[in-house]
Regions:
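A short loop-to-beta-strand structural motif that recurs across blades of beta-propeller domains
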Residues: 70-72, 126-129, 168-171, 216-218, ...
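Beta-propeller domains
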Residues: 63-85
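Beta-propeller fold detector
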Residues: 35-42, 80-88, 138-142, 179-186, ...
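Asp-box/WD-like beta-propeller blade repeats and closely related beta-sheet repeat scaffolds
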Residues: 123-156
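Short loop/turn segments that connect beta-strands within beta-propeller blades
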Residues: 74-79, 131-136, 173-177, 221-226, ...
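Beta-rich, blade/repeat-based domains predominating
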Residues: 43-60, 89-114, 118, 143-160, ...
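Secretory targeting and sorting signals
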Residues: 1-29
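Short loop/turn segments immediately following the C-termini of beta-strands
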Residues: 66, 119-121, 164-165, 174, ...
Length: 319
């Protein structure tokens, strides 16, 4: 396992934050988020480009390091540990939309088991992988080589997986087994060669999906029999939606737009405004995760190629 201590980096970050604004808190472009700071600077040369993250109970962050095919854990004191590395596809494999093998969404089950999506460009590797607390990662559901599994969420014993290439949402039993297409509504698709369905969450009996190419946030009800209901566009004009998370206030969400270098606060009525920009340290934000009023943003620097990082902030209720 790879261990990296970030203590010195975190100390330097704290100093920078203390100089940025009175009281040691950086100023965001909008008062919905305050105390914006860099939780950790990551190493681009080492492949540390986080695509998704989830927050553990102790405040540690589980990160998927996209093209490095790694899953890593960042502790509150700045230690970065590699939990697993997924197997590489054969040399020369062309992954749809991306070109290279790519670890995407991550979710943690109540028993601590982690699940991730993996787009590998082969029938033998693409799908949903389980990372047990002890032992090697194992694929629990196969998806076709043409799929690009991306966002991931758990709801009532089922894993829901967005597919950016096929414009679909797959459903997989938590215990593993056959993946089935749960929804393939036209609203989930992107233009040919573009990312469609991307970030995915479940809330209030519905699967919510961001469409990267269309800049929309979608809501798909889960029927009493588990089938997908009619897709509704809850917000549009958002730019390239990569990932999002709910704030805990109604259906308000924070949305990361990747090349756009912005985080948007989207209200339940579909209105939205920018709350973070590159001026706050964003470097192509790929994911947002909240625990209470703590907000974490993963920055992969896919396009800026500079300073991938994790930003932290505090959510101001009702802003």
């Amino acid at each position: 396992m790879r261990h990296v201590c970030r203590t010195a980096v975190l100390a330097a970050t704290a100093l920078v934050a203390s100089l940025a604004a009175p009281g040691g808190q950086a100023l965001a472009v909008d008062n919905a988020l305050t105390g914006v700071h860099v939780v950790s600077h990551l190493d681009l040369a080492a492949g540390e480009q986080p695509e998704n993250l989830t927050v553990e109970r102790d405040g540690s962050l589980d990160l998927t390091m996209s093209f490095a095919r790694r899953v890593e854990r960042l502790t509150p004191d700045g230690h970065l540990t590699t939990l697993a590395t997924l197997p590489a596809p054969p040399s020369g494999t062309d992954v749809p939309l991306i070109g290279r093998a790519f670890v995407g969404g991550i979710v943690q089950a109540p028993d601590g088991t982690r699940y991730v999506t993996y787009a590998a460009g082969t029938d033998a590797l693409t799908g949903v992988w389980r990372l047990p607390r002890h032992g090697a990662p194992r694929r629990v559901a196969a998806l076709p080589a043409a799929a690009v599994p991306n966002g991931l969420a758990l709801h009532r014993g089922q894993l829901y997986v967005s597919d950016s290439a096929l414009g679909a949402v797959w459903r997989v039993p938590l215990g593993g087994g056959t993946a089935t297409i749960w929804s393939q509504s036209p609203e989930l698709a992107g233009a040919p060669g573009k990312f469609g369905a991307n970030g995915l969450k479940v809330r209030h009996g519905a699967v919510w999906v961001g469409n990267f190419d269309r800049g929309t946030l979608l809501r798909i009800p889960v029927g009493h029999d588990g089938t997908a209901g009619r897709v509704r566009v809850t917000a549009d004009g958002l730019g390239p939606v990569d990932d999002f998370d709910f704030t805990g206030h109604g259906d308000d969400v924070l949305v990361a737009t990747n090349p756009g270098n912005e985080v948007e606060l989207v209200r339940g009525d579909g209105s939205h405004r920018t709350v973070l920009t590159a001026a706050d340290g964003l470097q192509n934000p790929t994911a947002v995760a909240l625990r209470g009023d703590r907000v974490y943003v993963a920055d992969a620097a896919y396009f800026t190629a500079a300073d991938p990082n994790i930003l932290g902030a505090r959510l101001n209720e009702g802003r």
